[in-house]
Amino acid sequence: MALPRQPLSLKARALGYLSRREHSRAELRRKLAPHAESVDEVEALLDWLEGENWLSNTRFAESVVHRRASRYGTARLMQELKTHELGDDALGEVKAQLQASEMARAKAVWERRFGRPPADMAERAKQVRFMVARGFSRAVVSRIIQGADALLDDGDEPV
């Protein structure tokens, strides 16, 4: 007969979560709170994890960007990161990094999804809606679609 399992300590739970993927401080606090006796216990553990560099909001933000930047625009990624209470410094750095690569990322997403200029206004609207829903700005989407139209007008094959 199997022995009953001992409940995991708060530290073991935290390390288990962090061993699977990066977490923000707020996300880890939310996951650990039901298992702690007090809020102070959770905060002390989170402070210790940050001191040991096992928990880092900056690393978490980089992880989210690395996982999702190839599919989503700056607006959508920033909205997701804001829900994790990262702080203005980390968000500012990430936003600057994302805006610098927004055009290239949007072009790659557009080419993967559509690959050719819109044939009519309905298709153009569909492409714009798709790209804006992915978090790309209307200005960037317009430039990409206009660039594709220009290629078609020149008689070249779209890239």
Curated annotation (Swiss-Prot):
Q: Which cellular component appears as one GO term in the record?
A: cytoplasm
Give the primary localization class.
Answer: cytoplasm
Which Gene3D superfamilies does the record match to this protein? Winged helix-like DNA-binding domain superfamily/Winged helix DNA-binding domain
Similarity field:
Belongs to the RecX family.
Native organism is Ralstonia nicotianae (strain ATCC BAA-1114 / GMI1000)
Q: Which domain of life is it from?
A: Bacteria
Arranged from A to Z, the UniProt key words for this protein are: Cytoplasm
Give the subcellular location.
Answer: Cytoplasm
**Its function?**
Modulates RecA activity.
Give the range the annotation lists for the signal sequence.
none
Name of the protein in question: Regulatory protein RecX
Fetch the Pfam families from UniProt. RecX_HTH1, RecX_HTH3
Q: Name one GO biological process term.
A: regulation of DNA repair
Key word Lyase present: no
